[in-house]
């Protein structure tokens, strides 16, 4: 059996878009990447699970062509002052990567979470409707 080569799949999943980037283990060299707008026509479908599946298949194929057989997954949501839960594409992307033949190592959530709070959008008096 051939030597396994691992990479890191960075999945950024918001409610507006999903972006998948595969890098080497150091994270410095990008192997392949894809976003929702590259696989679907309508803007509203960029964050959908279907778009995430198509992206993951495309990314897995490109990564395998470059010799990467397994990935550690880092899932990220917008975080900070925005939502801390990943969008609908995150789970679908991980499942599709596994089905496309990539070995999945560790799955980690790397959403930036503030330890205090930051000034909310809209300022001190809030959004005036």
UniProtKB/Swiss-Prot annotation:
Q: Name one GO molecular function term.
A: structural constituent of ribosome
Which Gene Ontology BP terms does the record give?
A: translation
Q: Where is this region: Disordered?
A: 107-129
Keyword field: Ribonucleoprotein, Ribosomal protein, RNA-binding, rRNA-binding
Q: Would you tell me the Gene Ontology cellular component terms?
A: ribonucleoprotein complex; ribosome
Where are the coiled-coil regions? none
Q: Which SUPFAM superfamilies match?
A: Translational machinery components
List the disulfide bonds in this chain: none
The record's similarity note reads: Belongs to the universal ribosomal protein uS11 family.
Subunit structure, per the record?
A: Part of the 30S ribosomal subunit.
Give the function comment from the record. Answer: Located on the platform of the 30S subunit.
Query: What is this protein's record name?
Result: Small ribosomal subunit protein uS11
Task: Look up and give the organism this protein is from.
Answer: Methanoculleus marisnigri (strain ATCC 35101 / DSM 1498 / JR1)
Q: Which gene encodes it?
A: rps11
């Amino acid at each position: 059996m051939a030597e396994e080569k691992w990479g890191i799949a960075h999945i950024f999943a918001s409610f507006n878009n999903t972006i998948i980037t595969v890098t080497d283990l150091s994270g410095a060299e990008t192997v392949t990447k894809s976003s929702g707008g590259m696989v679907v026509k309508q803007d509203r479908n960029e964050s959908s699970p279907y778009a995430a599946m198509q992206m993951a298949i495309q990314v897995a194929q490109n990564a395998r062509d470059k010799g990467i057989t397994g990935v550690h997954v880092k899932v990220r949501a917008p975080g900070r002052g925005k939502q801390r839960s990943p969008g609908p594409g995150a789970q679908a992307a991980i499942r599709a990567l596994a089905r496309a033949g990539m070995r999945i190592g560790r799955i980690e959530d790397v959403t930036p979470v503030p330890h205090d709070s930051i000034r909310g959008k809209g300022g001190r008096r809030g959004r005036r409707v």
